Amino acid sequence: MSATEQTLDEMLHAVADPTRRRILNALKEKRACSIGKETGLCACDVEQRMHLSQPTISHHMGILKKAGLVQASKQGQWVWYRRNETALRELARNLRSAL
């Protein structure tokens, strides 16, 4: 299996779950605690939006991060998540060429 195929498989696994797709959609929007799209969404905003516990959000974010679809940065006590638009475009391009 080539590196591109392996990356595509990881990305497809990440977006196969409806909760993770909802998280990716939520990351498009600015929420209450979030200061801007450059920073992304605060983990607390993701929790509130998804109505899920912090450990569940961490689990899903870990899978999205491993696939390269989200980026995280820690600022103080908070973790801020944002979409990796380059990786999402790559996913769409690789999916088109794989099928």
Predicted regions and their residues:
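N-terminal helix-turn-helix DNA-binding core of bacterial DNA-binding proteins
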Residues: 10-13, 19-53, 79-86
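Beta-hairpin "wing" of winged helix-turn-helix
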Residues: 65-75, 82
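Short, intrinsically disordered or compositionally biased N-terminal tails of bacterial proteins
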Residues: 1-8
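Base-recognition residues in the alpha-helical recognition helix of bacterial helix-turn-helix
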Residues: 25, 58-60, 77
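Short, charged/polar, Gly/Pro-enriched secondary-structure boundary elements
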Residues: 87-91
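Alpha-helical residues within the helix-turn-helix
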Residues: 48, 59, 65-66
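Residue-level signal for well-ordered alpha-helical positions
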Residues: 27, 94-95
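A common structural junction motif
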Residues: 98-99
